[in-house]
Amino acid sequence: LRSLGVSRICRQTVKNILQDENIEPSPTRRRGTWDDYLKAHAETLWACDFFTKRTVSARGIVDLYILVFMHLESREVIVSQSTRKPNSAWVIEQTQAFVEQTEKREHRPTILIHGRDTKFSADFKATLKGRGVKCKKLPVRSPNLNARVERFIQTIKTECLDHFIAFGKDRLDYLVREFAHYYNEARPHSNRDHRPPKDQSSVPEWETIRLAEVVCRE
């Protein structure tokens, strides 16, 4: 207000502005919830996490790791290729690929939620910061705060990976890539009015009739 040349303002005007914006007075103003945070940043908020799949190779049974990124508003997922050694360098490489894939979008990522795994190193954060993406580390023992990514991991396992024996890295990468494509392009999501994540069309308005207009014909 001062920049507009308004030097004095009465208490009632302040009160009216707060009421118009649904802002409670300071003594009763509550802190925002995690759900409030997700909604406020929904268009540009992503989250990531790891999951594993046991595969069969010439060396025997091998656990392979995959990094998944999810856009929390649309539920779109981007998955990495698998690796036996998910070190910090590999995580940075996959993160760079994720940023390159999304940075030209209308709503490019600005915040990335991640867990407390040591593979999310200082170099990982610097890589994102250099691309204009802020990291938000989750509190200790709070997987429920990353529930949407955890739910996708459960979905890909129960609907796809648990039904296959993956013979090697290439086979696993193929399975994950194909399921991610199906998930993004065709699988309905209840939180999106049963539309897949990449379906941006508006929900049609169904025509309704009054009960008195229902006619029974024998």
Regions found by a protein language model. Give the residues of each.
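Charged DNA-binding/catalytic regions of mobile-element recombinases
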Residues: 1-218
